[in-house]
């Protein structure tokens, strides 16, 4: 459930946002943003409304935008900011977003929800979006049983860490590391 918390609410008690270090502020903002994106995912996983573009695809697209933007911002801060503590906070933030991305791609309830959306009368771009989205879920291993999905999750996380460790960037930014599938 969305707690409605904002970054300022997560600041240490007795301190204003101005008293918080830039690294701590980034960590607070990241946690808030990842929490907001996670709420969207959980709402979609529990969604019982009409399976149409407005009810399913728009919130899913918002989730994708939040995750992609968050990964990009964290990656840039991690690579170029002169403050080591802030770079570490950005690295931790990037990891949170990438974990959420993996969780999203392996969410069977979300996959099944998107698969139920009738796009037969939608425009060709929407139809293609759904086609590619479902393909990406399948490549991630969403159709496998829970034990294999857990293994996929572990392998994908390991691949992302190796990719980052080699300075190859993140897959969201065009890293040449391939996420293994089963």
What do these predicted regions represent?
Residues 1-182:
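Zn2+-dependent metallopeptidase catalytic domains
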């Amino acid at each position: 459930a969305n707690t409605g918390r904002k970054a300022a609410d997560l600041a240490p008690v007795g301190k204003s946002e101005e008293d918080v270090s830039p690294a701590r502020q980034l960590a607070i903002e990241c946690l808030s943003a990842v929490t907001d994106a996670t709420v969207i995912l959980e709402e979609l996983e529990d969604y019982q409304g009409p399976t149409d573009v407005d009810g399913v695809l728009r919130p899913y697209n918002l989730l994708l935008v939040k995750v992609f933007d968050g990964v990009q911002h964290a990656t840039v801060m991690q690579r170029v900011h002169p403050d080591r503590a802030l770079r570490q906070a950005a690295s931790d933030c990037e990891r949170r977003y990438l974990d959420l991305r993996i969780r999203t791609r392996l969410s069977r309830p979300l996959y099944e929800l998107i698969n139920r959306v009738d796009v037969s009368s939608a425009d060709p771009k929407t139809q293609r979006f759904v086609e590619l989205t479902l393909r990406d879920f399948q490549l991630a291993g969403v159709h496998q049983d829970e034990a294999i999905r857990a293994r996929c999750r572990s392998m994908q996380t390991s691949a992302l860490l190796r990719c980052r460790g080699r300075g190859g960037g993140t897959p969201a930014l065009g890293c040449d590391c391939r996420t293994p599938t089963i």
